Amino acid sequence: HPRVRRLRQMCIRDRLIITGGPGTGKTTTINTIIKYFEEKGSEILLAAPTGRAAKRMTEATGHEAKTIHRLLELSGMPSDESTGVNFERNEDNPLEADVVIIDEMSMVDIFLMNSLLKAVVKPTRLILVGDADQLPSVGPGAVLKDIIKADVFNVVRLVKIFRQEEAGDIVTVSYTHLRAHET
């Protein structure tokens, strides 16, 4: 099936954005991606910008999600960057995983994104999920929108709105409603 092939193709990319408005299947797609990588025996890390978003991600996926700060291991050491924060996980001590999935990316500012990119080095896959049309983070930058415009990540836009409770098998729903567009 062509949609199944597209989903597999998107999962082999090392940098991917999944974007769509409310009800378009972002969480369903995350669950499908998790299942795909679990079947391959991959180590998967999940995170979101806030404790509340991480808790929702944990509930929706059945897998532990952390805040990005916790994932990157916020350090008590002072930082020489303008952010005033320092993380244990960085280019010298990268995250140890095959796949890192970050949800609610519209809430991430440029400083946190910079730290995240330093800690996720190839061959680790980085999958960013969020609604590019949401209001940007309270910190500087509209990171998700800017990355999409910069054309440095592959982008999947989920456009069809559906109700999850009407969905049968979660994988079937993702395959059916996924429209991949590389920008």
Predicted stretch roles:
Residues 1-12, 177-182:
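Single conserved hydrophobic/aromatic residue that forms the stacking wall/gate
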Residues 18:
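Hydrophobic anchor at the beta1->P-loop junction of P-loop NTPases
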Residues 22:
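The conserved Walker
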Residues 25:
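Conserved glycine(s) of the Walker
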Residues 29:
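Hydrophobic positions on the alpha1 helix immediately C-terminal to the Walker A/P-loop
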Residues 43-48, 52-119, 160-161, 170-171:
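Conserved P-loop NTPase motor core of helicases/translocases
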Residues 98, 123-127:
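Loop/turn-to-beta-strand initiation segments
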Residues 133-179:
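Conserved helicase motor core of P-loop NTPases
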